């Protein structure tokens, strides 16, 4: 059995949760992939995958082996370029996840700089409002807002995002400018929640005494940050959003800031990555570059 090839097959089966899809990826018969994984499990003396009729899931032992196997293959890739000091010679794949608003307004406009410096690196970019499972889904690093991450990962604080309250000119012409949070009962607030069915607390205001919540009007709740911004631009209500996500709209006059003295608490931003023994050089390079780019826009 080719141990390295078996590890590659195992990793792909784990990530795709399917023997068939992994076999298609490698252009191999499904039976061949299954036999090699079984041989790997027999050699290790433990079950790595839990097989059902619909999907394949990692066992606890499989999760541990998955992470170590990823490290081994990453280190082998690094070893190929060990004596090549030129950063342009570094190659390999990076899988990252960044919130949609940050990816659209900050990362993607600057990403060509990194790819130009490191043409051998292939990037897989994921953007979700809901947190991804860093370990299970095989991410090298992610940008997280708010709450601290789960076990098995390391969080590197990057800074805070300033929040602003804003609405479209059309909305303000129709409903007027609120002068204080107490006025919001007669205004429409677009509400955001990652999970529909969970009623948001209301309009958030940070103060020296902590966060305060004010009652407000409004009939729209969304679970997508992209739709949240679009709703604000469409005049459906006031939104509370990171300034970086609306800076162009504010400059162009498509949104206008309201209640500047009553902003929500700044949003903490962290760079999160798996707790491995040693990060690959390409992961380190990307995280250093990303932290430098983010620094320009954080408080």
UniProtKB/Swiss-Prot annotation:
PROSITE patterns: HTH_LYSR. Residues 1-59 form the HTH lysR-type domain. One of its GO terms (molecular function) is sequence-specific DNA binding. InterPro entries: LysR_subst-bd (IPR005119), Tscrpt_reg_HTH_LysR (IPR000847), WH-like_DNA-bd_sf (IPR036388), WH_DNA-bd_sf (IPR036390). Keywords: DNA-binding, Transcription, Transcription regulation. Pfam families: HTH_1, LysR_substrate. Signal peptide: none annotated. Residues 19-38 bind DNA. It comes from the Bacteria. GO terms for biological process: DNA-templated transcription. The keyword Repeat does not apply. CDD domains: PBP2_CrgA_like_3. Belongs to the LysR transcriptional regulatory family. This is Uncharacterized HTH-type transcriptional regulator YhjC. It comes from Escherichia coli (strain K12). The gene is yhjC.
């Amino acid at each position: 059995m080719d141990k390295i090839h078996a590890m590659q097959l195992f990793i792909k089966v784990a990530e795709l949760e399917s023997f068939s899809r992994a076999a298609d990826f490698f252009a191999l018969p499904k039976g061949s992939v299954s036999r090699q994984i079984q041989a790997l499990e027999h050699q290790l003396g433990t079950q790595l995958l839990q097989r059902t009729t619909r999907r394949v899931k990692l066992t606890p032992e499989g999760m541990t082996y998955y992470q170590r196997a990823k490290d081994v293959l990453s280190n082998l890739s690094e070893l190929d370029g060990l004596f090549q000091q030129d950063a342009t010679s570094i190659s390999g794949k990076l899988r990252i996840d960044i919130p949609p608003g940050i990816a659209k307004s900050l990362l993607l406009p600057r990403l060509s700089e990194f790819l130009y410096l490191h043409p051998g690196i292939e990037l897989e970019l994921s953007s979700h409002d809901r947190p991804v499972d860093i370990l299970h889904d095989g991410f090298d690093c992610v940008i997280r807002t708010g709450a601290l991450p789960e076990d098995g990962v390391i969080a590197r604080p990057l800074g805070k995002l300033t929040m602003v309250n804003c609405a479209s000119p059309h909305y303000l012409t129709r409903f007027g400018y609120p002068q204080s949070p107490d006025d919001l009962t007669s205004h429409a607030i677009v509400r955001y929640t990652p999970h529909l069915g969970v009623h948001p607390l209301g309009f958030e205001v940070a103060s020296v005494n902590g966060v305060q919540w004010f009652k407000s009007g409004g009939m729209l709740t969304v679970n997508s940050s992209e739709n949240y911004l679009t709703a604000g631009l469409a005049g459906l209500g006031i939104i509370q959003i990171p300034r970086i996500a609306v800076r162009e709209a504010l400059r162009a006059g498509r949104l206008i800031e309201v209640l500047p003295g009553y902003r929500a608490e700044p949003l903490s931003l962290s760079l999160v990555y798996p707790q491995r023994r040693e990060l690959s050089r390409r992961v380190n390079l990307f995280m250093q570059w990303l932290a430098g780019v983010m620094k320009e826009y954080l408080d």
